[in-house]
From Swiss-Prot:
Belongs to the triosephosphate isomerase family. This is Triosephosphate isomerase. Its main location: cytoplasm. It comes from Haemophilus influenzae (strain PittEE). PANTHER family: TRIOSEPHOSPHATE ISOMERASE. The gene is tpiA. Involved in the gluconeogenesis. Catalyzes stereospecifically the conversion of dihydroxyacetone phosphate (DHAP) to D-glyceraldehyde-3-phosphate (G3P). The active site is at H104 (electrophile), E176 (proton acceptor). It is an enzyme of class 5 (isomerase). GO terms for biological process: gluconeogenesis; glyceraldehyde-3-phosphate biosynthetic process; glycerol catabolic process; glycolytic process. CDD domains: TIM. Pfam families: TIM. InterPro entries: Aldolase_TIM (IPR013785), TIM_sf (IPR035990), TrioseP_Isoase_bac/euk (IPR022896), Triosephosphate_isomerase (IPR000652), Triosephosphate_isomerase_AS (IPR020861). GO terms for molecular function: triose-phosphate isomerase activity.
């Protein structure tokens, strides 16, 4: 089946109110006529309100609804209560966020988030009607030891074991080899395709229908120079973009490359 690509910008710990407004104005100008590719941005949660306001009334022929959708970089498993500093699914929905990143290697590393905890976040998002963007991927040591497939399977199975394979209906997986994040290194298109094909095949062993529709993004130092070649691969359905998402022209090139390659 034809899968509609998704290119999502993960701003990480970057930005300000002024930066958020300026970048979104640039993105709206660059992307107002793009079709055939879903686009999302995940600013820091402090700036979701600023981003929501900046995205409204985009000035194109879409009836006031921007082609760019809001996302977020994290969520908690609790809906409310005494959980200082955490953000709930309902809070994210209140700002119009749709695509929520979970399991990013930086969360797994710096905040010690386990596969099982990430799976609970996945379940909380599904219950709230939000779209999980599940990040998976191996470290450099695991890659060199030939454990890429083992690691990816384990991280996917944590969700399947907790929620069933059908939980991946309408969900997104982002393969992000840790050794390629923010390093300037990137898997070759063939290397990335091999892992994406494995991920889809691993899910297909449980359900072919679920595997065929799940969006699998690549997320390792994607930029305006390497995106087009990555998107020629049949199992790469878009990108989770870090540094390049902070510059409107570069991010727009990536979005347009996905739209051109997949349509």
């Amino acid at each position: 089946m034809a899968r509609r690509p998704l290119v999502m910008g993960n701003w990480k710990l970057n930005g300000s109110k002024a930066f958020t407004k300026e970048l979104i104005e640039g993105l709206k100008a660059e992307l107002h006529d793009v079709t055939g590719c879903d686009v999302a941005i995940a600013p820091p949660v402090m700036y979701l309100g600023t981003a929501e306001a900046a995205l409204s009334g985009c000035g194109c022929n879409c009836g006031g609804k921007s082609v760019i959708q809001l996302g977020a970089q994290n969520v908690d498993i609790n809906v409310k209560g005494a959980f200082t500093g955490d953000i709930s699914t309902e809070m994210l929905k209140d700002f119009g966020a749709k695509y929520i990143i979970i399991g990013h290697s930086e969360r797994r590393t710096y905040h010690k988030e386990s596969d099982e905890f990430v799976a609970k976040k996945f379940g909380a998002l599904k219950e709230a009607g939000l779209v999980p963007v599940l990040c998976i991927g191996e470290s450099e040591a695991e890659n060199e030891a030939g454990k890429t497939e083992e690691v990816c399977a384990r991280q996917i199975d944590a969700v399947i074991n907790a929620l069933g394979v059908e939980a991946f209906n309408g969900a997104v997986i982002a393969y992000e080899p840790i050794w390629a994040i923010g390093t300037g290194k990137s898997a070759t298109p063939a290397q990335a395709q091999a892992v994406h094909a494995f991920i889809r095949g691993h899910i297909a062993a449980k359900s072919q229908a679920v595997a065929e529709q799940v969006i699998i993004q690549y997320g390792g130092s994607v930029n305006d120079a390497n995106a087009a070649e990555l998107f020629t691969q049949p199992d790469i359905d878009g990108a989770l973009v870090g540094g390049a998402s902070l510059k409107a022209p570069a991010f727009a090139v990536i979005v347009k490359a996905a739209a051109a390659a997949k349509n």
